[in-house]
């Protein structure tokens, strides 16, 4: 084969006439000054060297495709080159033909895509659409005759990767920059979570302005939390297609704008509608920041960084009544609460928009577009571009699969229920404390807000403890292959503290007992809730590693639903059951849930194999 007869110059024994020595030495692509011209004739294409079979094998690429990273695009399935977003190669280009030579073949989804382009039909069942993955080769839909006869991806396609030491790869950014971005993004989560509970420190101002009861005023909190559960349906696809930075810029910009009608709302209906939309817009901070942090750290070291993300959504709501109780008492103005919230959101909007793009698929997509322009080769692309992205795939990844998991995965549902309980209890505290410290002790909103400080202190204590848990996990990784159950140490430590906090709260809610008694319950609860969330979040990821985003979406929906529901009956519960039994009822439930992390630690693997329709966990990875 003559070099000038081929668009891509990949080297292999089957396709190259170069010498064996030359064919095993990949050459780095160097753009020319004329590379900016995109309308090149075929004989004017700038040829580039790409990876060979040997160079890929030397980097550990084998015939068996690994499970995609948790941050890989969810709209594409059965990738033949899932390491594209994490692997660095000397040339930055990997031909499909070379992958075929190694033993990687096009998958059912890519063949289906080709048939659709060619105009052929490709019917499949809903179950196949939801469950098709690398471990289901022998199932219906993956081994059909139609699939075997379908053509593979064009062998002249060249997949783009990061080059060795690529400064565009977020993993290669200096450590201080990555940790700085981690802290800033965690503050973004605190900002969003703060916004959900900001009005809880001044519900009396809502009652006074609109002449409504407390139950109606509480809806201004609940509806924003409900918005958190629906927003990911918008921002996850936007992030997959256009990147994290675009999603933050658009969503946080809308959030800032919609705080204006919240402050100026002429009636309660307008306020509630705008609060719901604020939840939808701002939810990008809750559903994408964990991914942004994971983008910047390899899987071996991202655990400690993710701990900051686990800390933020539980501390943010606590800051709401802490700050706005003083605004409510000193000014009595509801609108000022939203102006302060808008200012905080505006600052974080600017900061989040200034953080560079961290999502590897989008970075590589832009790099591929640049290389196509410089070389004139239209077949340089990412695997996501080669397979194509359809709205149907987006809907399956973002909506249908989470719903599917919620009815077919009992282990996931039980884990999500515990996360939902802890999150709901946090929002219950926002309305239990005003009853205990406001009605019993006679404190005003500003002093009631100060009672939330112990929760923050407990959460900070838990954040430090997550580093201990992470070090223990890394020790296990060095000794043997880890299991999802190894992630449960934090939950086993934190679960008793969350229950103890509620027992203390009920036992000390007497006027003759100094306020330190019930306030100290916040220390134990803050410590327990962060550890439980940190641990169970990692457990869900490891149990459903192949579809982690969908499993986490199920968690977000159930958690937000619980967080929205609990405030609606907390005050009535404390009034009907009294201050002691109101807390003890929740304490009984929390005490029963202590068994969950311990039970899963001992029997989790067996339960997953018996109760789950399929094993999605890291245990299934050879």
UniProtKB/Swiss-Prot annotation:
Disulfide bonds: none
Location relative to the cell: Cell membrane
Positions of post-translational Phosphothreonine modification: 98
Region described as Disordered: 1-76, 105-152
Gene Ontology CC: cell periphery; fungal-type vacuole membrane; plasma membrane
GO molecular function: antiporter activity; spermine transmembrane transporter activity
Positions in the Cytoplasmic compartment: 1-182, 237-245, 297-305, 357-416, 468-487, 534-550, 605-622
Induction: By transcription factor HAA1 in response to acetaldehyde accumulation.
Topology in membrane: Multi-pass membrane protein
UniProt KW Cell membrane keyword: yes
Superkingdom of the organism of origin: Eukaryota
Compositionally biased intervals (Polar residues): 1-47
Keywords: Antiport, Cell membrane, Membrane, Phosphoprotein, Transmembrane, Transmembrane helix, Transport
Residues recorded with modification Phosphoserine: 55, 101, 132
Function field: Cell membrane polyamine/proton antiporter, involved in the detoxification of excess polyamines in the cytoplasm. Recognizes spermine, but not spermidine.
Family as reported in the entry's similarity comment: Belongs to the major facilitator superfamily. DHA1 family. Polyamines/proton antiporter (TC 2.A.1.2.16) subfamily.
Protein name: Polyamine transporter 3
Record organism: Saccharomyces cerevisiae (strain ATCC 204508 / S288c)
Gene this chain is encoded by: TPO3
